[in-house]
Amino acid sequence: ANPRVRDEIGELSLVSPEERVSGPGATTIMAAFTHLNAEGSRFSDGSYGVYYAAHSLATARAEVGHHRTVFLRRTDEPALEIDLRLITANVEAELHDLAGAEGEAALRAAQRFAAVLDPDDYAASQRLGRQLRAAGSWGLRWPSVRDPRGECVGIFRPRALRHAKAAAHIAMHWDGTRFSHWYEKGGPHTVGV
């Protein structure tokens, strides 16, 4: 097989044939399951992929900004601009809901899931993710820990997602210590002769 194509596809054997998706947007969906983060993530110990998304651009920026900040500080990166693509997709599966409660139920849920929603320690959330995935769960939704008004989803199975497509391109400016600003990139403009 062509090594370049193999690198683009990732480790396809991580996804069972019946869970694989194809067609428009499939590469974007499958990438989360075939290109693993060896360090793990909120709901994965690094041995399997999870497709993470946020309900809004503001929440996505907060979540991505946090994780990129951790990486850029750890690698002591100088000022730079990071280009990101906003992807929209439909979640077409029933998810375990850690975010949907209101009133008293919301308070009880917050107490019950406090360890799972810890902003820095992922031990409890990785245990929960492993248990839910092993039980065949499609994924879960939870209140963002980086944006108090936001919600996130973590999808364990590619077939839960449909119609993934690029919606916008944004750039986040890293000033060497933090993200100072972001902007949406517009369409191309012809350069005058």
Report each predicted region and the residues it spans.
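Extended catalytic/binding region for NAD+/ADP-ribose chemistry, centered on the ART fold
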Residues: 42-68, 139-142
